[in-house]
Structure formats: C-alpha cells, structure tokens
Amino acid sequence: MKRWQAFKTLGLFGANLLHLNWDNMTHFSSIVELQDIVAELAIFEQKLARFKQRLNLNVEQYQADHISLRCHDISVAERWRKGFLQCGSLMSESIINGRPICLFDLEHPITVLNWQIDCVELPYPGKKTYLHQGWEHVELVLPVAPEILSTAAKALLPQPLPTGFSVKESQPKGEQERLPNPTLAVTDGEITVKFHPFTLREIVKS
C-alpha cells in the first residue's frame, strides 16, 4: 500500500502513526540478498542510455511500468525473491510460458535514468542459459489500443534498425489475466526495451 492509499484508509490519526515509520521502510539498495543487482544498476543505466542513443529513441514521456531481471540459476531467483520481499510485496505470481513470473510492488521506487520504477519483474529460470544474470529490460506503456500497439511502437524506431538490433512481438498471458497484453521488444542481445498498452497492475487486476 502506497503512502496516499494508507492515509486515505487509516484517516488522520492512523496516517500520523504510519508517517512515523514510513521513512524507515527498507530501500532495495540496502538488502543483503540484492547487492549484486544493486551494484549492477549503474552499469545497466549506462548501457540503456547508449541503447537509446543508438536508436535515437525518445521515450522519456512514457511511463516505465517495470524493470525486469533474468537468471538461469534457481538459487539466484530464490535469493532475489527473498530480498524483494524485504522491501516490497508480492503483487502477482503467474505461470507464463511454463515458468513462474513474480511481480514485486516496491515501497520505494528504483531510479533508472529519468524514471522512478516501483515494480520489478522476476521470471524464474526456464531452459535458457544466460551469459549474464541480472537486469534485462525496461518495459514502457504506450497508451494506445492493443490492436495498434505494434504499429505505434515501430513508429518510434528507426527503419531499418541499426546492425545488431532486432524486434520481437509476443503476447504473454497469465492464467487469470483478461486484458490483452501485446508486447513489442527491441533488443541488441544484451539490453531490451519493451512496449505494451497496459500497466502490469492493470493486467493483474483484470
């Protein structure tokens, strides 16, 4: 529950009590189990900035819905899960493409470039092995109808794409989710930016 929601629910007296402890809530950067990805965040930001520059991608006006990790080691996934539960709450856990995908609602957002991101996606390992386990993509919300998501996202990209970049389209869907979630991803094989028409919170609530 975010601060304004808590104030509304608890009323003035309860909000005053809550305010006394709110600033003591744990930020992800102080969690022992997350120190590997805390240390990596600045590197990820630098790579993301270069990625945007190469594509001349001007997307700062769009909401960064979430940031996602990747890993192939189950022990790493479990450690990250334990860590995020100390600085947020589990919003959702769904089976998508045969593996669990966890979404964490953070009490304090993570700063990535000019975005404040308070949702982290943790996909559990599948069959792939990665050269690197850590931050993988940022997903942005394009506020358009689902049926034109692909066209709208491609309009933001240069044509043709620079060498080494590729585009992939998909439609991930959890077992209980009703909203369509068409997704377009552009990647250089290391960093990925994805676009979809709804926030993950909207999709989970559907």
Which role does the model predict for each range below?
Residues 25-65, 69-206:
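Glyoxalase I/VOC metalloenzyme domain signal
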